Amino acid sequence: MKVLILVLLGVVILQAAPIRKLEDLLPTRNPPQNELVYWCTYANQCDFCWECIHGICRNRIQADWPVIHQNDWIINCTVSRWNGICRYYEGPRGHIDHEMDCANPTYHTYPHIEYMKIYVRDDL
């Protein structure tokens, strides 16, 4: 009897709280602010993840990342989402295209972090 009550309760809860599907995102170079953590985790070299002033750049989302010199490692990106598939395009149109399941994202291996030019203050 207890099992039946638990099953019925589970069915009622599932029907009361419908599963939210992520809205589609048309290709953009400026993803919504509330999605920056997601995009900057998996596409961290994209220019929208960095704030650069006078050639010195700080990651806007991940505070533990080093401060770096603005260089070719930071690239223009376009991101999009369609039917649960997240994509980002790096560099010039058609340069590198990475596709992943939005619910089970994966890291892209290019460009490698060793190409970052870490900023070191020499006046300390």
From Swiss-Prot:
<comment type="function">
    <text>Plays a role in virus cell tropism, and may be required for efficient virus replication in macrophages.</text>
</comment>
<dbReference type="Pfam" id="PF01639">
    <property type="entry name" value="v110"/>
</dbReference>
<feature type="glycosylation site" description="N-linked (GlcNAc...) asparagine; by host">
    <location>
        <position position="76"/>
    </location>
</feature>
<keyword id="KW-0325">Glycoprotein</keyword>
<comment type="similarity">
    <text>Belongs to the asfivirus MGF 110 family.</text>
</comment>
<keyword id="KW-0732">Signal</keyword>
<feature type="signal peptide">
    <location>
        <begin position="1"/>
        <end position="16"/>
    </location>
</feature>
<dbReference type="InterPro" id="IPR004848">
    <property type="entry name" value="ASFV_fam_110"/>
</dbReference>
<protein>
    <recommendedName>
        <fullName>Protein MGF 110-8L</fullName>
    </recommendedName>
</protein>
